[in-house]
Amino acid sequence: VANAIKLLGKSMRYVLENNGTTFTALKNELNHIETYIMIQKMRFGDKFDYELCVDDDIDTEQCRILPLLLQPIVENALVHGLEEKEEGGMITLQVERCGGSEDIRITISDNGCGMDEATLAQLRRDIEEKNPEKKESIGLYNINQRIKLCYGEQYGMAVQSELEKGTAVSITISMKTQQFV
């Protein structure tokens, strides 16, 4: 219980410190995800594992990202992808440079239930177009809009999924213009 309270406090501190801020270090956002995962592991036990992979040429202290961007995606992976799995669930967070460019791609993937083609197509539409009747996809829509507003229209979110194999949500952002000065 004491550890859970400590982790919840750490998570709340991050949320409050970043309320109203434009950018935070990628390292801070990844630390927040690690805290969130530890809290969820208390809830789910050994039903899932987590792996973080960051390319060596990405300086997570210098690279800046919109705060609170990744947690809703990790939460979706747990709730929609892995919650029904009894064991062997896996969430992977991969941070990589896109080719030789100054862009980075952050991919959050799970080995959960995945989606059929029709569900995936609808989710992709919901991410791009606001649908007031669909409350479920509003978080992903908002994340995609935040990315486009802050980084430009060429950036954003992409979703891949295969039924019974899992889902991957990728965010592409610019690393070049978001360096600490």
Predicted regions and their residues:
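Two-component histidine kinase transmitter core
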Residues: 174-178
